[in-house]
Amino acid sequence: MTIPELPKDLIEEILCYVPATYLKRLRSTCKGWNRLFKDDRRFAKKHYDKAAKQFLPLMSTNEELCAMSVNLHGTIPSLEVKDKPWLFVSDSKHCDIEISRIFHSGGLLLCFSRDGEISIIVWNPLTSETRLIRTRNRRDKGRNFVLGYYQEDKKTYYKILSFYLDSKDFEIFEFNSDSWRFIDDICPGLSLLYSDQCVSLKGNTYMFAIDDLSVSLLKYDFSTETSVPVPLPYKSRSFEAISLSVVREEKLSVLLQRDKSSKTEIWVTNVIDETTTKVMVVSWSKVLSLDLSPDLKIRYGESFLLDEEKKVIMIFNNRMEEENKSEDKLYIIGDDDNKATQVYTIHGYGPAVFNYFPSLVQIEQSSRQEEKS
């Protein structure tokens, strides 16, 4: 008895709910599915909207990008770093680029190097698609980049924002036109802080800024190319420690320590009102209040991840072990006893941890010259 084939539309509808990492395994089983997963922007958008999000904790340094497996179920938390790091050596076009920083937005990674002339690569690790972004011949020292996106007419458009901390020099890169253009000051009356403390949530970039009165949080909207202030849980002229993270692509999380004698607090957003164009309406809840050992001094911009349900954070901490020699140690800290468990030591420069969610999203190529990854 011949089994009837299911209608194509029904098959696509079923596949839209299958997590992205499982779809990758199915690519080799059928040429039609391979084309659907790899080349069909319509299906990629539909899958992005409907499929359950997977979150893969990643650790990056200037040398490699590794997946991690975190175990919080035992009496002592543990972490396993996958043996095989994700490197660009599998792509001969970009194997000579040493990555110094990675920024995640909407399933894509923006990777750039500050060694000599700046190189930028936008990369989808799931599909292996890449695009090399060329920068204009300008001052490279101190230049920073973030990736963001917005939706219009049921399509998703990505842009790159370029900025410096020491000047009011801002540019936008348009993927479709393959070109850079100058834009107006995105933070009038403010100065941006901590270039490595920017995060992307739902396409918008959040970053710290400061004026004469207090430290602020800004949301940069790539659709309007403007920013609005986001009130922090409380105001302060300065903080002993401050850092920013994203919780499961749904909430912002901020680490605050007012002064040396204060507890280290982790807050998350309950509500973010996206409709305002002046000052965002935000409510915060305090998830953790940690009384840490003086030996574990949290500094500005330490990269961290929060497990809101288990009330646990994973955070990097740079420590001087010997004269002129430092190590970055990764700790897991819980609310039950404030105990910090060291789970990993790394020697690479500028380590960071973040949650990556695999996606079939395709990298928009230039309309003037179609590039092949």
UniProtKB/Swiss-Prot annotation:
Residues 1-46 form the F-box domain. The keyword Repeat applies. Kelch repeats lie at residues 101-148, 149-200, 329-373. It comes from the Eukaryota. Pfam families: F-box, FBA_1. Coiled coil: none annotated. Keywords: Kelch repeat, Repeat. The keyword Calcium does not apply. This is Putative F-box/kelch-repeat protein At3g19410. It comes from Arabidopsis thaliana (Mouse-ear cress).
